[in-house]
Amino acid sequence: MKGSKSEVQGMVLTTGVKGLDELLGGGVARRVILQVYGPFATGKTTFAMQVGLLNEGKVAYVDTEGGFSPERLAQMARSRGLDPEKALSKFIIFEPMDLNEQRRVISKLKTIVDEKFSLVVVDSLTAHYRAEGSKNYGELAKQLQVLQWLARRKNVAVIVINQVYHDSNSNSLRPIAEHTLGYRTKDILRFEKLRVGVRLAVLERHRFRPEGGIVYFKITDKGLEDSK
């Protein structure tokens, strides 16, 4: 028996972009890890911030790169007629400075995240691994296991931002630790930069949506919007 429309809506968080919501089968799903990867300045952080801004519930935001901007979040809120202070108060920010701190922070989320939270973001999961030249993907897998536990036990959506590298074999940009993250992330979005302000989202993997779907979106003061 199919659930009601409200039940279905309650299991996803809107992205605020109609095209992206449709691409993801309604929005960012709770109880699942969504991986978003792509080159620098493609809108990945703005995407994660916007999902937190537009949905009820607190957000646990693990910022490993210093990319989270309170000023940008306030701008997005004001541009949408929302209270900037109220928007900022929803976000609980963690700033691990190295791999060890990142491991401790993610583990600590098991006791911090409760029913008041709707979203957990790690932006990005692989930055410190890349910076420190670590190939210890076993530790990365353990952190993903904790994030998967949070998604399922705490009924939250989890967004993991990932960086890219140039793969000489395929002559293309691929996500770091692709196989390790791919094992735990059921839904995968790739962001690409087309021209100033305009971006492309490609659905590389999904639990029930067809792979390869694409959506164009733009970056504005509001955050991300459909590109017409």
From Swiss-Prot:
Asked whether the UniProt record includes Nucleotide-binding among its keywords, one would answer: yes
List the keywords (alphabetical).
ATP-binding, DNA damage, DNA recombination, DNA-binding, Nucleotide-binding
Tell me, which GO biological process terms does this entry list? Answer: DNA recombination; DNA repair
From the record, give the transmembrane residue ranges.
none
Q: Does the keyword Oxidoreductase apply?
A: no
Q: Name one Pfam family in it.
A: Rad51
Under the heading SUPFAM superfamilies, the entry gives: P-loop containing nucleoside triphosphate hydrolases (SSF52540)
Q: Which InterPro entries match?
A: AAA+_ATPase, DNA_recomb/repair_Rad51_C, DNA_repair_and_recomb_RadB, P-loop_NTPase, RecA_ATP-bd
Give the UniProt family note. Answer: Belongs to the eukaryotic RecA-like protein family. RadB subfamily.
Q: Which PANTHER family match?
A: DNA REPAIR AND RECOMBINATION PROTEIN RADB, RECA/RAD51/RADA DNA STRAND-PAIRING FAMILY MEMBER
The protein, known as? DNA repair and recombination protein RadB
* Gene behind this protein: radB
